[in-house]
Amino acid sequence: MKLIARLMSMCAVLFFAINSAYADDEVRIVIDEGVEGARPIAVVPFKSNGSVPADIAEIITADLRNSGKFNPIPVNQMPQQPGSASEVTPDAWASLGIDAVVVGQVTASGNGYQIAYQLVDTVGASGNAGAVLAQNSLTVQPKWIRWGAHQVSDEVFEKMTGIKGAFRTRIAYVVQRNAGSHELRIADYDGFNQFVVTRSSQPIMSPAWSPDGQRLAYVSFENRKSQLVVHNLGSGQRKVVAAFRGHNGAPAFSPDGSRLAFANNQDGLLNIYVMNSNGGHPTKLTGGAGNNTEPSWTQDGRILFTSDRSGSPQVYSMSSSGGGATLIGGGRSYSGQMSSDGKTLVMISGDNVVKYDTTTGTSEVLSSTFLDESPSISPNGIMIIYSSTQGLGKVLQLVSADGRFKARLPGSDGQVKFPAWSPYLTK
């Protein structure tokens, strides 16, 4: 079966390290394709009264660009560099096709920094050119200054699009280091502020976030046996919740965090099971011919999964209590994830990331990279992160859901795979 061959290939990668090297310890975004045709916007360099540990405007610019919705203009093309709304000359920007400008200041405040911004209407869409569309002021500790910039991005993005921003989110991923160890890491969505959650001499696979962002479930091969671990990120406590006979893999939290869906082959074929997220007796949901794996939950509580029951892997949907399954991803498809609004299914098809519109039934190929795997959608459905093969290594890739913006996150000291996008976070 093709699905079995694919799973065996993935396991082979886990146990045999491929020699590759990356210069940096952290992943960093490298732009592959810009945002031609996206909405122009300007983020003016923020005024400051001294040294600031991060360029606030640069972070906001990158966030808006990464969404694929905006095309921020370069600083050297700006007709002026105002620090406040009162200094903005609307006509100077409107003549360039810029209908909104972000201006602001960063000032030292006690042991932290105060970030203040204003979003200015330059064309009178609000009824008054020069009007302030949104503004805020926040004080952050030095270590949270990038988080503060992401908050500004979230507020600007939501005001301009009506969609909640997802720049204050993180990604979990696995790094198989060149030295042979395996690390589960977390970083801000753009690759900054990386830290190691756990490391092991044995493989780690398939991290999955709880809906509150407080826990990660993942597959560990400690004791050379696959088992599911739930890791509390606040306390650091780790609990093995599944060490059943056979392979235990592909954990996924239910929308309320109370249950885990996972795959197990204790009966010979892979099937989908559900159990309490703290462990307990599992309930088998699938059966019959074929392998069933890679469960993921929709917001309304259904389970998507990959099955080769028809001869090749395809994405199906079923109730969380089991029963009949409905084919929703035609052709050769796997690793399905539904957007939170239920309108978009993202999956791998033909070894590339594909977006499927559940309303119209139309599909769009979003990636052009090689051997794509493990797509994960941002909580607002605007961006997708996945892993792909580059040369002899695995790297992370970022693509906007409209396909306009594409980037790599290659900077690491080993193979980077199994990315998982967090839910909305507070910090």
Curated annotation (Swiss-Prot):
What does the record list as GO biological process? cell division; protein import
Question: Gene encoding it?
Answer: tolB
- InterPro entries from the entry? 6-blade_b-propeller_TolB-like, PD40, Tol-Pal_TolB, TolB_N
Family in the record: Belongs to the TolB family.
Keyword terms of this UniProt record = Cell cycle, Cell division, Periplasm, Signal
Q: How does it assemble?
A: The Tol-Pal system is composed of five core proteins: the inner membrane proteins TolA, TolQ and TolR, the periplasmic protein TolB and the outer membrane protein Pal. They form a network linking the inner and outer membranes and the peptidoglycan layer.
What does the UniProt function comment say about this protein? Part of the Tol-Pal system, which plays a role in outer membrane invagination during cell division and is important for maintaining outer membrane integrity.
Q: Name one GO cellular component term.
A: periplasmic space
Reading the lineage from the top rank, the first entry is Bacteria
This protein is called Tol-Pal system protein TolB
Give the transmembrane ranges: none
Q: What is its main location?
A: periplasm
Q: Which segment of the chain is annotated as a signal peptide?
A: 1-23
Source species? Actinobacillus succinogenes (strain ATCC 55618 / DSM 22257 / CCUG 43843 / 130Z)
Q: Where in the cell is it found?
A: Periplasm
- One Pfam entry for this protein is PD40
Name the PANTHER family on file. PROTEIN TOLB, PROTEIN TOLB HOMOLOG
